[in-house]
A protein has these predicted regions:
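Sec-dependent N-terminal signal peptides
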Residues: 3-13
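Beta-strand/beta-sandwich contexts
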Residues: 16-45, 103
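Immunoglobulin-like IPT/TIG beta-sandwich domains and homologous Ig-like subdomains
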Residues: 31-81, 86-90
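Edge beta-strands of extracellular beta-sandwich domains
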Residues: 93-102
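Low-complexity, Pro/Ser/Thr- and charge-rich linker/hinge segments at domain boundaries
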Residues: 101-121, 126, 130-131
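Substrate-binding/active-site clefts of carbohydrate-active enzymes
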Residues: 128-173, 177-297
Length: 297
């Protein structure tokens, strides 16, 4: 019996392991003091959550027991590391995560883009290859293939940084890059609009620090950067699409439905409900799951 109890306890610990936390960190002094933290792990909703040093307002559970949504109030939060602990029904600590609240850096006050700006739209994979060592990555399916018209050609963040003199000489004041977050589509991933991780720069473009370095280089020149970040849909290779928190997390039909792209329907008082639904809830392409923006989480 004692041996079985030990096995049972070990299985509890194994089941409760935190696999992901998003966002992975946050900042003090944000204008919006509310923060929602997603915790993901096998059957993690079965456990109680306690937080030391952070004001945990409530914990929301969903259909899928692999998720917990933690709502915090950071009105008076200071930078530092704070424990998020999981406890079982016997009040035994099962797992722990040290969550970081960073200090906001006092950067230069740079105004938003306006009619005086010359904006240059860059598709990074097609612009310049500054680091050939990251053209392919073992974690991602599609590899570099310059012979393929729709394949990856190797452009990256380093290529943009190395050409800032050229862009500035052209009179460019603002760079708008197409999305740079990870896209693990097996084909045509160079456009990066089917994001599979919205907290990670695609390794074939560089790292999160490389993106930060690009922004710093631009700001030192008095230039601006526009971040293209997709919130309408995710790629079907995104880990959450493979294990949905709720059935209504994405838009679904009895069979696959593509958006009709008829934007005028949205403001047309005579448009049919069917056409409006297809416009708003239809998918761009089969590899891009349309997110349900009506879901409160």
């Amino acid at each position: 019996m004692r041996y079985l109890s030990i096995l049972f306890f070990v299985s509890l610990i194994t089941n409760a392991q935190i696999k992901r936390i998003e966002p992975p960190f946050w900042w003090e002094g944000m204008n919006d003091s509310k923060l929602q933290v997603l915790i993901y792990g096998d059957n993690i909703a079965r456990y109680k959550v306690k937080s030391k040093g952070m004001d945990l307002i409530n914990v929301e559970r969903v259909e899928n027991e692999n998720y917990l949504f933690l709502n915090f109030n950071l009105s008076f939060q200071k930078k530092g590391f704070y424990d998020i602990d999981l406890y079982d029904s016997f009040d035994r600590k099962i797992d722990n995560y040290s969550y970081e609240i960073k200090s906001r850096e006092k950067g230069k006050k740079i105004s938003s883009f306006n009619s005086s700006d010359v904006i240059y739209l860059i598709m990074p994979d097609r612009f310049a290859n500054g680091n050939q060592s990251n053209d392919s990555h073992p974690d991602l399916t599609e590899k570099v293939n310059r012979k393929e018209q729709d394949g990856r050609h190797g452009g990256d963040i380093e290529g943009i940084i190395k050409n800032l003199d050229y862009l500035q000489e052209l009179g460019i004041t603002t760079i708008w890059s197409t999305p740079l977050c990870e896209d693990n589509d097996p084909k045509v991933s160079y456009h990066t609009y089917a994001q599979s991780d919205v907290y990670r720069i695609d390794p074939r473009f560089g790292t999160n620090n490389d993106y930060k370095r690009l922004a710093e280089n631009l700001h030192q020149r008095g230039m601006k950067i526009i971040m293209d970040y997709v919130t309408n849909h995710w790629g079907i290779e995104h880990w959450m699409i493979k294990d949905l928190p709720n059935k209504d997390w994405i838009h679904k039909f009895d069979k696959y439905v593509n958006t009709n792209h008829r934007k005028e329907i949205h403001s047309d008082p005579y448009a049919s409900k069917k056409d409006k639904k297809e416009l708003i809830q239809g998918w761009f392409v089969p590899s891009m799951a349309d997110l349900n923006q009506s879901n409160p989480l």
